[in-house]
Amino acid sequence: MEYVPDAEIWDLYNENRELLGKDHIRGEQLPIDGYHLVVHVWIRNSKGQYLVSQCSANRPTHPLMWECVGGSVVKGEDSLSGAIREAKEEVGVDLMPENGQVLFTKTRKIIEGKIFNDIMDVWRFEYDGEVDLGNATTDEVAQVAWMNREQIKELFDANMFVDTLEYFFTEVDK
């Protein structure tokens, strides 16, 4: 593997979530037998609303679409650390580890004809603190909002919510 400055490096796993001892550079083709760890983070307040974010217009994937916090776990991180880091980076929120739980894990090989090869942990965190995008460390998000199930469904039905997150209605907010 060639060194690339500022590249995001992932640990590679096999299908059974066992570390392979190999690194992978984001953006390169994943090996057929290599998987990387990703997290989706649903942040819920005591009113039963979820913090969702609208992707910035310049983001390469899903510009101006709404979604939950999420991203790839980087080399040396575990799923929980990745979930907490992504929440801070994307929406400026400091989540407490004890307020989170993994709802389910899914291994995804191919989505819409594209090789994904990821192991996705879906987290839900309870959070009633302030949300200030000024504390975010990336510019991936244009805006955030607390929404209930019906509001998220309206966005989804209007094709304004990332379609691979449809599991929200059956697995996250049951």
Predicted regions and their residues:
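Acidic, metal-coordinating catalytic segment for phosphate/diphosphate chemistry
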Residues: 1-40, 44-46
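Conserved hydrophobic "DFG−1" position in protein kinase catalytic cores
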Residues: 12, 43, 52, 124-125, ...
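Nudix hydrolase/Nudix homology domain
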Residues: 19, 27, 63-64, 75, ...
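Active-site segment of metal-dependent pyrophosphate-handling enzymes
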Residues: 37, 47, 57, 88, ...
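A glycine-rich, hydrophobic loop/mini-helix early in the fold
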Residues: 38-70
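The catalytic Nudix box helix
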Residues: 51-52, 68-102
